[in-house]
């Protein structure tokens, strides 16, 4: 599905949206009518043995249409935006070579940005540096590391909460490895390549006209996860000696809150409330990312006929029937 620099770029349809916005339903509706394969754009779905809390597509759903970039790594390992970009570009070509149509679907906007806009020259993760920062945080607390970050990269520190451990750790890691603030490196021109330039990525964005409706869905879905055995899932992960709350997998929304409950740090109701709140905050960040994409095609994800609207929009993109 690649194209020469002189030819017209191949359109790649992308179904993006916040958590609980109906992406799976829309993708499956399209799969019933088109020979598609779904490439997941979701940083949580890459992990094996994390099914309930990530709302992973069911076995039946995955049997109905091929899914990619799901269950590809162990929770003890990390998966970067650079790895996603390479995998997604490879899969797009492979799916097209089979005579089928790739559909990118998910809500990890950092992955989508890396795919469509290229990568910054940020250093890769270093386990030794991360272990040292984790030890410092265990001794002094993440607010102290946030204060340290403010001294070397005030721009990044200003946009992070003092307990945002994952992002504070990454920003300090980048500074320690490169000697430059992450904010400076992110402001530098991104690296592009001919392979991505062969494609025209068209984002179809599922966004709520009434955020309260989406919030209600989030609460219902979190309760359904709890009823489906989410706590037992986290307990099985927690028994593994190689997993801990410092890992990206265990920082996924819901998992941290359930882990803290199992540690005895919170009661059940507090765990539930914190899990729902964290999911709502994730939803807010996802919508903010989407609204920064002027090229997106918006579908109201809380409309009564949202799935039909999304299906119609996706088919218009695939058939090149969009207004110019």
From Swiss-Prot:
The positions annotated as site (Interaction with substrate tRNA) read 108, 130
Q: Mind telling me which SUPFAM superfamilies this protein's record contains?
A: P-loop containing nucleoside triphosphate hydrolases (SSF52540)
Q: Which Pfam families match?
A: IPPT
This enzyme catalyses: adenosine(37) in tRNA + dimethylallyl diphosphate = N(6)-dimethylallyladenosine(37) in tRNA + diphosphate
One of the protein's GO biological processes: tRNA modification
Q: Which residues bind ATP?
A: 17-24
Which InterPro entries does the entry link to? Dimethylallyltransferase, IPT, P-loop_NTPase
Outline the segment boundaries, as ranges, of region: Interaction with substrate tRNA.
42-45, 166-170, 251-256, 284-291
Mind listing the UniProt keywords for this protein, alphabetically? ATP-binding, Magnesium, Nucleotide-binding, Transferase, tRNA processing
Q: What class of enzyme is it?
A: transferase
Keyword flag ATP-binding: yes
* E.C. no: 2.5.1.75
Tagged with keyword Lipoprotein: no
- Binding-site residues for substrate, renumbered to this chain: 19-24
Q: Which cofactor is recorded for it?
A: Mg(2+)
Q: Which GO terms fall under molecular function for this chain's record?
A: ATP binding; tRNA dimethylallyltransferase activity
Q: How does it assemble?
A: Monomer.
Record-linked HAMAP family = IPP_trans
* Described purpose of this protein according to its UniProt entry: Catalyzes the transfer of a dimethylallyl group onto the adenine at position 37 in tRNAs that read codons beginning with uridine, leading to the formation of N6-(dimethylallyl)adenosine (i(6)A).
Q: Which family does it belong to?
A: Belongs to the IPP transferase family.
Record's protein name = tRNA dimethylallyltransferase
Naturally occurring in which organism (per UniProt): Burkholderia ambifaria (strain ATCC BAA-244 / DSM 16087 / CCUG 44356 / LMG 19182 / AMMD)
């Amino acid at each position: 599905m690649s194209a020469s620099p002189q030819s017209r770029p191949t359109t790649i349809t992308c179904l993006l949206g916040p958590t609980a916005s109906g992406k799976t339903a829309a993708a499956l509706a399209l799969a019933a009518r088109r020979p598609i394969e779904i490439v997941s754009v979701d940083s949580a779905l890459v992990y094996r043995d994390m099914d309930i809390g990530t709302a992973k597509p069911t076995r039946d759903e995955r049997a109905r249409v091929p899914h990619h970039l799901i269950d590809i790594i162990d929770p003890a390992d990390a998966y970067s935006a650079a790895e996603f970009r390479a995998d997604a570009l490879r899969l797009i070509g492979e799916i097209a070579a089979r005579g089928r149509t790739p559909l990118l679907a998910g809500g990890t906007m950092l992955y989508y940005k890396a795919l469509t806009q290229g990568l910054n020259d940020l250093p890769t993760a270093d386990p030794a540096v991360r272990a040292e920062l984790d030890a410092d945080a265990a001794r002094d607390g993440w607010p102290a590391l946030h204060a340290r970050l403010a001294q070397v990269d005030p721009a990044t520190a200003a946009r992070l909460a003092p307990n945002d451990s994952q992002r504070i750790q990454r920003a300090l890691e980048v500074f320690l490895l490169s000697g430059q603030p992450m904010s400076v490196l992110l402001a530098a021109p991104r690296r592009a390549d001919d392979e991505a330039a062969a494609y025209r990525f068209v984002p179809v964005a599922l966004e709520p006209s009434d955020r309260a409706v989406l919030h209600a869905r989030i609460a219902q879905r979190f309760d359904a996860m709890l009823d489906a055995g989410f706590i037992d899932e986290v307990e099985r992960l927690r028994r593994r000696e190689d997993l801990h709350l410092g890992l990206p997998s265990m920082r996924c929304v819901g998992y941290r809150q359930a882990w803290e409950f199992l540690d005895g740090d919170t009661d059940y109701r507090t765990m539930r409330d914190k899990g729902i709140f964290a999911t709502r905050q994730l939803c807010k960040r996802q919508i903010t990312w989407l609204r920064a994409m002027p090229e997106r095609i918006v579908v109201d994800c809380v409309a009564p006929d949202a799935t039909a609207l999304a299906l119609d929009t996706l088919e218009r993109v695939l058939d090149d029937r969009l207004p110019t």
